[in-house]
Regions:
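Ligand-binding beta-strand-loop-alpha-helix segment within the catalytic cores
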Residues: 18-61, 83-166, 174, 210
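Short Gly/Thr/Asp-enriched flexible loops that form oxyanion-binding sites at enzyme active sites
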Residues: 72-83, 169-180
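ATP/nucleoside-binding phosphotransfer catalytic cores, i.e., glycine-rich phosphate-binding loops
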Residues: 202-269
C-alpha cells in the first residue's frame, strides 16, 4: 500500500486557507509557511513570489491589470517570469508618492509591462492634491481621460496593504506623504489600514476625511467591481487590517504568510 504524507507546515496552511474561505467571501486564500527565523523582508519576498505565480496563472490576453505601489509589489514584479508574455494593458490605480523611487507605482507599472509585455498607462503626477477642485480639474484634462476610462475596465488588480491598527505601521508614514494633522484626522475616524492610497476603518469602509476627495486613486466603488482583486500581505501585525479588508470585500484573493493567516482566523468574525 502506497501512502502520501503532507509535511505538517503545509497541512496547517491548507487548514488556514479552508477556514478563511469558509468565513469570508473569497475566491482563493493562498497561505504560505512561516518560519520563526525569517525576517520581515524574507516573508515579504516569499508572499510576493507566490503573488507573482498566482498573477501569471490568472491573467489572460486582453486583461486590463491594475497595479498599486508598495514594497511587496516591488518584490512581486522582480520575480515575474518574462517568458510568459501576454497581450495585456497595465494601468496605475493611483498617482505617485514623492521621494519613493523604486516602490512608486509609475516605476512598477513600467517594469511589469516590460516583464509581461503589453501597453502601460500611468498618472504622471503626485496622488495627493491640494483640493477636491484641483483633482477634478486634473481628471477632466484630455490626456487623463484614457486612464480614467481604463480604471473602470480593470479585470485583475494586485496590491499590498498598509497597516494602521493597532500600530501605525504603514510605509506611507515613512514617505512624508501625510501631515501630522492628516494622521490625527484618520485616527479620529478609526483608521485600520490603507490600500491604493485610500484609508479604511475596521469594516473596510473608507474613512471620511478631506483626503478622500483630494486623492488621485481609483474609488472604492469602482475598485470593488473589479472581478479579481488580489491582495498580498505578510506579518502578523497586519491581522486587524486584513480582517477589515475581508469585511469590506476589498479582496477576492488573499496571499498571506501562515502566522498572519493564523492571527486573522483567531480574531475573525
Amino acid at each position: 500500500m502506497i501512502t502520501f504524507q503532507i509535511p505538517s507546515p503545509f497541512v496547517e496552511c491548507l487548514e488556514a486557507s479552508r477556514l478563511l474561505l469558509e468565513r469570508y467571501n473569497l475566491k482563493e486564500a493562498i497561505i504560505i509557511p512561516s518560519h520563526e527565523e525569517s525576517s520581515s523582508k524574507e516573508m515579504r519576498q516569499a508572499v510576493a513570489l507566490e503573488g507573482a505565480r498566482y498573477l501569471q496563472r490568472t491573467i489572460s490576453d486582453k486583461d486590463v491589470i491594475g497595479v498599486a505601489w508598495g514594497r511587496t509589489m516591488n518584490h512581486l514584479i522582480q520575480v515575474l517570469n518574462p517568458c510568459q508574455k501576454k497581450d495585456n494593458t497595465f494601468v496605475s490605480m493611483h498617482g505617485s508618492i514623492p521621494h519613493c523611487q523604486y516602490n512608486d507605482v509609475g516605476s512598477l507599472v513600467s517594469r511589469i509591462s516590460m516583464a509581461l509585455g503589453g501597453q502601460r498607462f500611468c498618472f504622471d503626477t503626485d496622488a495627493l492634491m491640494r483640493s477636491k477642485e484641483e483633482l477634478t480639474r486634473f481628471l477632466n484634462m484630455e490626456e487623463n481621460q484614457k486612464i480614467a476610462f481604463l480604471l473602470k475596465r480593470i479585470s485583475v488588480s494586485v496590491s499590498g496593504v498598509g497597516s494602521l491598527y493597532p500600530e501605525l505601521d504603514s510605509p506611507l508614514l515613512n514617505n512624508n506623504y501625510l501631515q501630522q494633522a492628516d494622521i490625527k484626522a484618520l485616527q479620529a475616524k478609526g483608521v485600520y489600514g490603507d490600500i491604493l492610497l485610500r484609508f479604511f476603518d475596521e469594516n473596510g469602509e473608507e474613512c471620511e476625511t478631506d483626503l478622500k476627495d483630494r486623492t488621485l486613486s481609483i474609488d472604492f466603488d469602482t475598485y470593488r467591481n473589479i472581478q479579481t482583486k488580489i491582495v498580498v500581505a505578510s506579518g502578523k501585525q497586519k491581522a486587524y487590517t486584513i480582517r477589515a479588508v475581508l469585511r469590506g470585500e476589498l479582496a477576492d484573493v488573499i496571499i498571506l504568510d501562515y502566522e498572519l493567516a493564523k492571527q486573522v482566523i483567531k480574531i475573525s468574525d
